[in-house]
């Protein structure tokens, strides 16, 4: 058997070089054609080499040779070189489909920002697909090493570039602050805030229904300010609590923000409340500060006034001179005698 195989290889070696020789000759023809000066579609000397139809056939044959097809077993290149292994191709297509879905979700959720609450399942899916590619490095030496061929086979490293873009966007939006620890669902605080946010917007819309048929925008939003005051205060209070909780959990990073969905929702509500509706809510902290300031201002007055009223008032005693005493006593004696 070994001898037969050796004979087959020795007898078939010229056929392996036939495509190379043919391709070399075709390239020489093309170089000769390119070197010819021409000013029109039919230039002198062109018919001596190849006609236009033959030139097209040469181009098609050259392309077929370069792609490894069209000649069957006589192909220059291995048939599997331009394409990936089936397993690697499947992993790449899974990542491509997941990336396309996540990209579409991110763009649709750009304004108003609903990135974290809408796209977190798709982000988890992309992370899983990327992890599958990274882990698939081939169990044996003969197995497909998809991680290397898909991630680091070229200078561009497009798969890694796309994955890093998603990760950096997710970190910039701080979506982890809106999700649970495993990132599979929204946190309780986020759900409560979004519920209050929707109720506040519904209150705004309900109290504006009477002005929808007016051609000019209304200038008086007293109904909105009066009826939605409690909802707005509850939303602001919950947002402040979430900020304090986030500050306690991230003492090492004092500038850590809440997730972009919560921040954008609160910014929208504040703009509607203060700029559009021109509503104002008296802050309880301001009242307390003013009261304490007035008390401290009048404290010295109260202190001096109370000390003056409750201090012991000593009566002044006049000391008469001796001469005055003797004269007064003598006058008294004369009065008694008369």
Swiss-Prot record:
Which tissues is this chain's protein expressed in?
A: Expressed primarily in osteoclasts and melanocytes as well as brain, kidney and spleen. Found at lower levels in the thymus, testis, heart and liver.
Q: Which GO terms describe its biological process?
A: osteoclast differentiation; transepithelial chloride transport
Q: What membrane topology does the annotation report for this chain?
A: Single-pass type I membrane protein
Which of the residues are on side Lumenal?
35-288
Q: Which InterPro entries match?
A: Osteopetrosis-assoc_TM_1
Record localization: Lysosome membrane
Residues in coiled coil: none
Disease entry from the Swiss-Prot or TrEMBL record:
Defects in Ostm1 are the cause of the spontaneous gray-lethal (gl) mutant, which is responsible for a coat color defect and for the development of the most severe autosomal recessive form of osteopetrosis. Osteopetrosis is a rare genetic disease characterized by abnormally dense bone, due to defective resorption of immature bone. The disorder occurs in two forms: a severe autosomal recessive form occurring in utero, infancy, or childhood, and a benign autosomal dominant form occurring in adolescence or adulthood.
Q: What is this protein called?
A: Osteopetrosis-associated transmembrane protein 1
Q: Which organism is it from?
A: Mus musculus
């Amino acid at each position: 058997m070994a001898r037969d195989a050796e004979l087959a290889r020795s007898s078939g070696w010229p056929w392996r070089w036939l495509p190379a020789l043919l391709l070399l000759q075709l390239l020489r023809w093309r170089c000769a054609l390119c070197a010819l000066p021409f000013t029109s579609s039919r230039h002198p000397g062109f018919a001596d080499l190849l006609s236009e139809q033959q030139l097209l056939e040469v181009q098609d044959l050259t392309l077929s040779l370069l792609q490894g097809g069209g000649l069957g077993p006589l192909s220059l290149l291995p048939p599997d070189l331009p394409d990936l292994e089936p397993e690697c191709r499947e992993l790449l297509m899974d990542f491509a489909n997941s990336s396309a879905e996540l990209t579409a979700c991110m763009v649709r959720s750009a304004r108003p920002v609903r990135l974290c609450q809408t796209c977190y399942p798709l982000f988890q899916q992309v992370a899983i697909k990327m992890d599958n590619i990274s882990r698939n490095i081939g169990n044996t030496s003969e197995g497909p090493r998809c991680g290397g061929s898909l991630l680091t086979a070229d200078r561009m490293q497009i798969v890694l570039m796309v994955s890093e873009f998603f990760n950096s966007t997710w970190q910039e939006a701080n979506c982890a602050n809106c999700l649970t620890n495993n990132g599979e669902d929204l946190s309780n605080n986020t759900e409560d805030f979004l519920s209050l946010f929707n109720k506040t917007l519904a209150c705004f819309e309900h109290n504006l229904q009477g002005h929808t048929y007016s051609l000019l925008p209304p200038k008086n939003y007293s109904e909105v300010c009066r009826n939605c005051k409690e909802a707005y205060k509850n939303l602001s209070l919950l947002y402040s609590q979430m900020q304090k909780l986030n500050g306690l959990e991230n003492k090492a990073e004092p500038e850590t923000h809440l997730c972009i969905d919560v921040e954008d929702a609160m910014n929208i509500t504040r703009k509607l409340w203060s700029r559009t509706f021109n509503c104002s809510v008296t802050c309880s902290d301001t009242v307390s500060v003013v009261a304490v300031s007035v008390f401290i201002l009048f404290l010295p007055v109260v202190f001096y006034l109370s000390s003056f009223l409750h201090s012991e008032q000593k009566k002044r005693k006049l000391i008469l001179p001796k001469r005055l005493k003797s004269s007064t006593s003598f006058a008294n004696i004369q009065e008694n005698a008369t």
